[in-house]
From Swiss-Prot:
Residues that hold substrate according to the record: 89-92, 111
Entries under CDD domains matching the protein: RraA_family
Protein name: Putative 4-hydroxy-4-methyl-2-oxoglutarate aldolase
Source organism: Albidiferax ferrireducens (strain ATCC BAA-621 / DSM 15236 / T118)
General function of this protein: Catalyzes the aldol cleavage of 4-hydroxy-4-methyl-2-oxoglutarate (HMG) into 2 molecules of pyruvate. Also contains a secondary oxaloacetate (OAA) decarboxylase activity due to the common pyruvate enolate transition state formed following C-C bond cleavage in the retro-aldol and decarboxylation reactions.
Keyword check for Zinc-finger: no
Catalysed reaction, written as an equation: 4-hydroxy-4-methyl-2-oxoglutarate = 2 pyruvate; oxaloacetate + H(+) = pyruvate + CO2
Transmembrane segments: none
Lineage: Bacteria, Pseudomonadati, Pseudomonadota, Betaproteobacteria, Burkholderiales
């Protein structure tokens, strides 16, 4: 279950943070998933026009057990901002939901938009693009990324709602 939060309230509470522990992603991402509000610890993938590592991630367990219960993770994908190929489609979106992921954020494109809207998963990306990726088996995971100029690290917490997305070095709610 997603805890109750509002990104505006989180920004109000952390507006004077100059340490870099609290960050705000720019408002360039569109909402494609069936879930509008989501949060969780971040897992990272870096790939360019090859979604092999995205597929491997969403086909793995997308949650962690905590004393408070099961917490879905958020996959953050650095697709280099490419608008030429889709890194996530209906099949992979369904796999992510089935495996317990809370959300997927892609600095790149998605496809199968109507299928993604029906999936119980938060999905943010730059745009839709019907072309699939090449399958070269390339990509890296579990590394610090710069997404639209903002640092995102494995283990950060990402909070997303209708107002935007914020990151924190640890869990806030």
């Amino acid at each position: 279950m997603t805890p109750s939060f509002a990104t505006c309230d989180l920004c109000d509470a952390h507006k004077n943070d100059v340490s870099g522990a609290f960050r705000v992603l720019p408002p360039v991402f569109r909402d494609f998933g069936g879930v509008r509000q989501f949060c969780g610890p971040v897992v990272t993938v870096k790939c360019f026009e090859d979604n092999s590592s995205v597929k491997a991630a969403v086909e793995s367990v997308g949650y962690q057990e905590t004393p408070a219960g099961r917490v879905g993770k958020v996959l953050v994908v650095d697709g280099g901002g490419s608008l030429r190929r889709a890194l996530l489609g209906g099949n992979l979106g369904a796999a992510a939901a089935r495996n317990g992921w809370a959300g997927v954020v892609i600095d790149g494109c998605v496809r199968d938009v109507s299928e993604l809207a029906a999936v119980g998963l938060g999905i943010r990306a730059l745009a839709s693009m019907p072309l699939p990726t090449e399958k070269r088996g390339e990509g890296q995971s579990d590394l610090a990324l710069q997404i639209q100029g903002v640092w995102v690290r494995p283990g950060d917490w990402l909070y997303a709602d209708e107002d935007g997305m914020v990151l924190a070095a640890g869990r806030l709610v």
